[in-house]
């Protein structure tokens, strides 16, 4: 049995989970609504505000899907109840972030400012010129948008300049030594 898959998933108050045909699960909560279709072999049950995921056999594919399905359901429930956020820091002289309407405008050493338009359901906040926070209900999309922002100018190993995740440690390298 999968250690993750066999865990029961309690549904918090204020969150409703509906199981539709074709193994499609819709989760609704105070922060929003998420819908996802899961593999037809996975059996998802809702009993007394508890979600359980069972697998039909011990085949390698089913074992892998079991834990994955349980984790994705857990992320959906957590997303609509609490939400997810990912913080980014801008390190470098003159590196700034600003919000222009719905867009994020980054000045990170290029000859032009870089504009990033978030997807629907994703919110970008700029608490200070060197900090950016990506918020949303879908953990996967929040992480993807944060990765796209980081990819604009990923941290370089010599001076450490660039956009990094909050708390990320950039491995530094020594420069060339003169003869």
Swiss-Prot record:
PROSITE patterns: RIBOSOMAL_L6_1. GO terms for biological process: cytoplasmic translation. One of its GO terms (cellular component) is cytosolic large ribosomal subunit. Gene3D superfamilies: Ribosomal protein L6, alpha-beta domain. Keywords: Ribonucleoprotein, Ribosomal protein, RNA-binding, rRNA-binding. HAMAP family: Ribosomal_uL6_B (MF_01365_B). This protein binds to the 23S rRNA, and is important in its secondary structure. It is located near the subunit interface in the base of the L7/L12 stalk, and near the tRNA binding site of the peptidyltransferase center. This is Large ribosomal subunit protein uL6. It comes from Bacillus velezensis (strain DSM 23117 / BGSC 10A6 / LMG 26770 / FZB42). The gene is rplF.
């Amino acid at each position: 049995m999968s250690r993750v898959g066999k865990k029961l998933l309690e549904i918090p108050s204020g969150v409703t989970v509906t199981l539709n045909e074709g193994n499609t699960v819709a989760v609704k909560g105070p922060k929003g609504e998420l819908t996802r279709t899961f593999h037809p072999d996975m059996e998802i049950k809702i009993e007394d505000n508890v979600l359980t995921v069972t697998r039909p056999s011990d085949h390698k594919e089913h074992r892998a899907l079991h834990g994955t399905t349980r984790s994705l359901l857990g992320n959906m429930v957590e997303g609509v109840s609490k939400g997810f956020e990912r913080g980014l820091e801008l390190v470098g002289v003159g590196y700034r972030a600003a919000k222009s309407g719905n867009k994020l405008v980054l000045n990170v050493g290029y000859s032009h400012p870089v504009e990033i338009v978030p997807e629907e359901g994703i919110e970008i906040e700029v608490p200070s010129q060197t900090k950016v926070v990506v918020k949303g209900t879908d953990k996967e999309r929040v992480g993807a948008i944060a990765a796209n922002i980081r990819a604009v100018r990923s941290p370089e190993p010599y001076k450490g300049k660039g956009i990094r995740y909050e708390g990320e440690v950039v491995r530094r390298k020594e420069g060339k030594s003169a003869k």
